[in-house]
Structure formats: structure tokens, C-alpha cells
Amino acid sequence: QGTVAFFDLQPGLKLALWPRQSLAADAGLPLTATATAMSLAHNVLNETDVDAIMQQASMAGAPIVKSPRKTFWGGYAGYFQDPDSHLWEIVWNPDFLP
């Protein structure tokens, strides 16, 4: 689905850059010139945390773009949009655990 580059910014904080086409495909959205040209990802400690945060976002009225599910790379993630339509990924990545 495209090459992704990870940068360690500080302990517990990473920057991931990948093509817009890959992001749109992963989130299940059409590729358009919108605020979804990027996403903010919040990495959590386990799948239960992903589900809890996604439920919290939904209860607050956030549109759930992609419900949490297992990923092709071995993690677990879902997407929602905030009131400004920014795309948020809530993700458990076992490779990022300390």
C-alpha cells in the first residue's frame, strides 16, 4: 500500500510520512483535496484502548470513518474525524511498544 517512513522524535513520539493515496486507501476514503491529506495517529498500549477511545470519540459525535480492526501489518486501528474534519487514527502497533 505504499512506503511509509517513521521518524523517532522523542521517546514515545514518532512521525510517520506516507503517500496521500495510501492514507486514503487505508482509511477507506476517496482521494480528494481535503483535510484528510494527513492524519494524526495516537498510538496506545493495546487493542482495548483503541476500542475505548474510538467509542469515546463516537459518543462525542465524531464520525467514525473506519471502525477498529486488525491491520495488514499486525496491529489494530480505527479512524475518526474531528469537528474540523481532520483524520485521527487510534492505533495499537506492537512494534512501537517499549
Give each language-model segment a name.
Residues 5-8, 28-98:
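Vicinal oxygen chelate
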Residues 22-31, 91-98:
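Short, basic, helix/turn surface patches
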Residues 1-24:
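Core segments of cupin and vicinal oxygen chelate
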Residues 11, 21, 44-46, 82-84, ...:
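Non-catalytic surface loops within mature trypsin-like serine protease
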Residues 16-18, 41, 91:
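Residues in well-ordered beta-strands of folded domains
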